[in-house]
Amino acid sequence: MSATLLRWVCTGAALGALCTTAPPAHAAPDAPGPEERSVTQLLTDLQRLYRSAEETSETYNATEEKLTEQRARAATLDRRLAKARASVRDSRSDAGRFARQQYQATSNLSPYMRLLLARDPQRALDQGQVLRRAAAGRAATVERLTGGEKKAGDLAGAAKRALAARTALAARQKKQRDRVEGQLRDVEQLLSSLTVEQLAALRQAEEADTADAQRRFLASGALGGSPATRPPSRQGDTALDYAVRQIGRPYKWGAEGPKAFDCSGLTQRAWAHAGRRIPRTSQEQWAELRRIPLSKLRPGDLVVYFRKATHVALYMGDGKVVQAPRPGARVKVSPIAANPVLGAVRPDPKGRAMDRYTPPKLPAKAKAVSGSDIGYDRSHAPGATDSR
């Protein structure tokens, strides 16, 4: 068995199998090599690798979003802490000035005796009122100083915790990135071990499976008996139009455009272009956006795939979606059943349907990127030029 294939067989994260560098004496026989497996087995293995990589990629995206939020929180706390410390310095300066004034004005005479001995008793009374106000000011300064020191201490603690959280998120992100890199290398290694004939057979098998899944999906009546296109909302129309204009751009994990996209990067960017902010990952989009029956789908709605909601696409109408499929592929139009459908969500549930609607015209390159998504390109791997 080649070293390349051995590494592929030992990919625990992708294949769910445990592999050690020194197998026990009674280890199970090695998995059959590519030349020994049927096209169906190869396609199943390859699709499992793709799904595993995409699932980890979406987890990475969620961590990236949390890390961005934590960086912003830490920066805000740092600014507030600097302001609080400046306020404490000012309060300490005021307190010192009042202390010096009080020391300089110290007298052994009681206020009553000072009033009796005053040349102008009324003026002495007025001065007493001024002094009382000054005393109140000193008390307020001391109170501000005490409160400011407490606030500065609290903010310093919060800033320290925010830094620790940011550091932990960055470490988690690196582990997830390394895992995606490994899973994408597994895809590359498997594909590089196949012959031209095997690759062609895989593409044909995938296209046949997709066509069969689409026929069964439409026959089930899941889309309400007819995949006819309903009019979208104005925002949905704008989001779909943006997605269609990205057809032909490469898939790249973690990418949010404008030169490359992953699946949820495309859906988020499309709806942002329409003026609505939606969550970054497919899992968050599924969890947080309004779910709708498939029978109510309209263009611009999001179709979510797989049991763990690890893939997402924009519904185009007529039983089709626009999606960024997976590494090695490009943004394209696909049958809605190209992957197992989990459900659908609507980013603008209160958006009124347009009175008149004309579907977007597909670019000429749409046909060139149709068909199977089998493939892999090193330029789409982690560490390649980042589009974000």
Region spans (language model):
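Hydrophobic packing segments in regular secondary structure
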Residues: 1-41, 168-245, 361-365, 369-373, ...
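Long, contiguous alpha-helical "rod/stalk" segments
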Residues: 30-100, 158-165
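Extended alpha-helical stalk/coiled-coil segments
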Residues: 51, 58, 65, 72, ...
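Short coil/loop "hinge" linkers that interrupt or connect long alpha-helical coiled-coils or helical hairpins
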Residues: 86-140, 195-224
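Long amphipathic alpha-helical coiled-coil segments
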Residues: 131-163, 245
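Catalytic cysteine-centered active-site loop
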Residues: 249-297
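...with weaker cross-activation on analogous glycine-rich loops/strands in unrelated enzymes
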Residues: 276-330
